[in-house]
Amino acid sequence: MTNSPPRSLITRLGIPPTLAWGYLGLLLFMIGDGVESGYLSPYLIDRGVSESRVALLFTVYGIAAGLAAWLSGVLSDLWGPRRVMWTGLAIWAVFQLLFLTAAIPLAGYPLMMISYGLRGLGYPLFAYGFLVWIAGVAPRARLGTAMGWFWFAFTGGLPTLGSLVASGLIPRIGSYATLWAALALVAAGGLIALLLVRDDHGGRRPRGAGDGPLATLVGSVTVLWRNPRVGVGSLVRVINTASQFGFFVIMPIHFTRTVGFSLTQWLHLLSAMFATNIFANLLFGVVGDRLGWRRTIAWFGGAGCTVSTLLLFYVPHVAGPNFPLALLVAAFYGATLAGYVPLSALVPTLEPKHQGQALAALNLGAGASTFVGPAVVAVFVGPLGVEGVIWIFAGMYAVSFLLAHFLQLPDEAGTARAAADPGTATAAASAPA
């Protein structure tokens, strides 16, 4: 039924055979999306856009991405995931073309806001549409593994391999041409996923009574106060990656202009940071099952990120452009971001009768982090500087450490009984940290 690579190995790896090409397409798409993540900010500043305007541009992009992340599941129910993915690919390609052919050459900031901001709708529709597709196709017994491979491809591309591609292309073809290469990668990945995946029964996610599109959309907001623990979990998810998206704005500038690293060195640090994160995602999933989800989130996520965020600033600040030391703290920061992985299982378990709404609320938190981080930078980097922004992010992580203690489950072990309940299988479909 599908045009896919050999199935035996794929099946053993836990990848649904009919969707195998989709994983490859997702990886290429996210590599293309991640190419700019380590250098677009300094590139625009070099072209005369102020630092605060760049931060605002990234904030608008994040708002669009957050909206698309929230809507992707509902639209997949209405249209089917394939159509949602086509929509995401088309949005990304059209507005990237506008950004490259008009906004950048004309140095028009309003046009940048329109083209780059609306392009932010693209990748969540494509990626999370595919995530819903996986949830509808993968056998329940292997759903967690299938979702693990999804996040491996997602974070492997954005920003890990994307930054490596940029570090290799920029010295050879320049920064502007590298943005065109990103478009080519996104187009190639999108077409591979959408043309080579020929699955006939994964178009729509099954819905239970009361879980229609409108009910899920409205309920994903009202559940935040109907069940305050879900609201707390969503807030913790916002904090989880807020610093990551804020650092995309200020850290390339800080590490290259203040600390003294070259742009290539910074891109290598960024790649190492999120390469560590990829494997730490798998590790903390296991740790959460052993230690308990809430404790893992609080100590490895909240407390860990509080420390690693400060180290990421102060170690290079004191040691200067010492690449091995910077590599260590960058890897430590990337690993601690993954300490929030058990949120994926915990939050839907807090609302067992409306897991779809809890998942949408968690995705809302994930999407919100993409603009909260740049917004913190835009508001505070002027009056407080980079150091002040770092302390704000560290303080947010300390707050998440405290909030995590309110995410109490009836079964604090949170593993054996939850794993035995078939209803919790859908928890794997939520966005990991």
Per-range role (PLM):
Residues 78-89, 290-303:
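Cytoplasmic membrane-interface "Motif A"-like loop-to-helix N-cap segments
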Residues 39-52, 249-265:
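Short amphipathic helix-loop junctions that connect adjacent transmembrane helices
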Residues 90-106, 303-319:
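C-terminal ends and interior cores of transmembrane alpha-helices
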Residues 2-16, 199-234, 433:
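Juxtamembrane intracellular "pre-TM" segments in multi-pass secondary transporters
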Residues 62-70, 159-160, 274-278, 282, ...:
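Residue-level signature of mid-helix packing/kink "hotspots" within the transmembrane helices
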Residues 115-153:
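Cytoplasmic helix-loop-helix junction between adjacent transmembrane helices
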Residues 147-163, 365-373:
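Glycine-rich segments within core transmembrane alpha-helices of 12-TM secondary carriers
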Residues 68-80, 170, 281-293, 381:
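Helix-to-loop junctions at the C-terminal end of transmembrane segments
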